[in-house]
């Protein structure tokens, strides 16, 4: 389950890719084959529209807790999920580690940026 406490995020981010690979790797490989097939591509698009909506709603719930706008959090979630799914399908440790490192640095930079704006009383983006 996704964390709602910022203190739990680091543990979650470290564990989820490996848990996802173990729990869902085979299923993701099958879904990839099916949803990229021309006969089923429209079903795949609909599936991912729902995924996009769910992650956006989650980002909106996180915004007041971590102080980063949901419009910034949402693409970070997408990068995280893509890295997890890619790892689950291909067990590509290099891809996973590089994506996680850029996410870690990105979140820290965004947190500093929006904390500074908040302290200055501004909302400039």
Protein language model regions, located:
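Residue-level recognition of alpha-helix termini/interfacial anchor residues
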Residues: 23-24, 90
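Short linear capping/connector segments at secondary-structure termini
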Residues: 2-3, 7, 32-38
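Hydrophobic alpha-helical connector segments
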Residues: 1-23, 77
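Generic alpha-helical structural signal
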Residues: 11-15, 45, 49-56, 100-104, ...
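Hydrophobic/aromatic-rich alpha-helical bundle segments in the mid-to-C-terminal region
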Residues: 49, 62-110, 114-125
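Short amphipathic alpha-helical interaction patches enriched in hydrophobic/aromatic residues
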Residues: 2, 39-42, 85-88
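Amphipathic alpha-helical packing segments from all-alpha helical-bundle domains
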Residues: 19, 23, 32, 39-67, ...
